[in-house]
């Protein structure tokens, strides 16, 4: 059965108030729509962990620093609702823009430190937009748990820190990246790739796995990175914005995985910006 689509905050709060009175836990899955199996895995995790589940769909203009990217972002509300129907979610919150950013809205949530590198450095203002809208969605839904994919690892860390710092009583649950058979991380942006582009994009993950394996065997990232960038270039990737080894908890740059670490990348292929990351096994002392 299809879940109700709610566009007004008052309607959302009426629903969640009833659930809370009944002592039911609420999970939220924030999305920008164009749902794929990665999103649906978050919905399944939320259903398993909470009594009630709200999926939010809002293409947030404040997190796009490129107007053309915003204009191209797919809007597929009816298809999204159809994909959610088998999961039995309790509400789909598709807020009208003025429910998020009413006239006179003047507040921005900014998280320093974690946002100074990688996505934050490449997309100025992006994470301020993310933190602001996610803070609003956390507060509007009153959810107990929020589900985010590890594909957007830096974003997941950002919203976790934001909720902690602002004393928002919610637990951020990270869920594994869902991948295509080729290893390509599922993303709404993938639908903009041609068939040939999808094939070439599938070469990103094997390059990352090879680097991770050699790091775990003791090689230094400084020695491996040039070859990895060359391999990505040969696959058709251009403008590799970052290819970094970072500490998993602080995003501090590393040369060897002497602590829990992630390998993270952002690069362009056929006019589409792709990001990915994987865990790297920690070296033994």
From Swiss-Prot:
Name the Enzyme Commission number(s) assigned to this protein.
Answer: 6.3.2.1
Query: Which InterPro entries has this protein been placed in?
Result: Cyt_trans-like, Pantoate_ligase, Pantoate_ligase_C, Rossmann-like_a/b/a_fold
Organism's domain of life? Bacteria
Q: Which reaction does it catalyse?
A: (R)-pantoate + beta-alanine + ATP = (R)-pantothenate + AMP + diphosphate + H(+)
Q: Which Gene3D superfamilies match?
A: HUPs, Pantoate-beta-alanine ligase, C-terminal domain
Please list the residues that bind beta-alanine: 63
A GO MF term: ATP binding
Would you kindly state one Gene Ontology biological process term found in this protein's UniProt entry? Answer: pantothenate biosynthetic process
Name the UniProt key words of this record, in alphabetical order: ATP-binding, Cytoplasm, Ligase, Nucleotide-binding, Pantothenate biosynthesis
Where along this sequence does the record place binding of (R)-pantoate? 63, 155
Main subcellular location of this protein, as a coarse class: cytoplasm
Kindly tell me the pathway this chain contributes to.
Cofactor biosynthesis; (R)-pantothenate biosynthesis; (R)-pantothenate from (R)-pantoate and beta-alanine: step 1/1
Matches recorded under CDD domains: PanC
Q: Which residues form the signal peptide?
A: none
Gene Ontology CC: one annotated term: cytosol
Binding-site positions, ATP: 32-39, 149-152, 178, 186-189
Which compartment or compartments is the protein found in?
A: Cytoplasm
Please name the HAMAP family in this protein's record: PanC
What else does the entry mention about this protein? The reaction proceeds by a bi uni uni bi ping pong mechanism.
Which proteins does it associate with, and in what oligomeric form? Homodimer.
Function according to Swiss-Prot or TrEMBL: Catalyzes the condensation of pantoate with beta-alanine in an ATP-dependent reaction via a pantoyl-adenylate intermediate.
Q: What is this protein called?
A: Pantothenate synthetase
Give the species: Ruegeria pomeroyi (strain ATCC 700808 / DSM 15171 / DSS-3)
Could you read off the lineage of the organism from its UniProt record? Bacteria, Pseudomonadati, Pseudomonadota, Alphaproteobacteria, Rhodobacterales
Q: Which gene encodes it?
A: panC
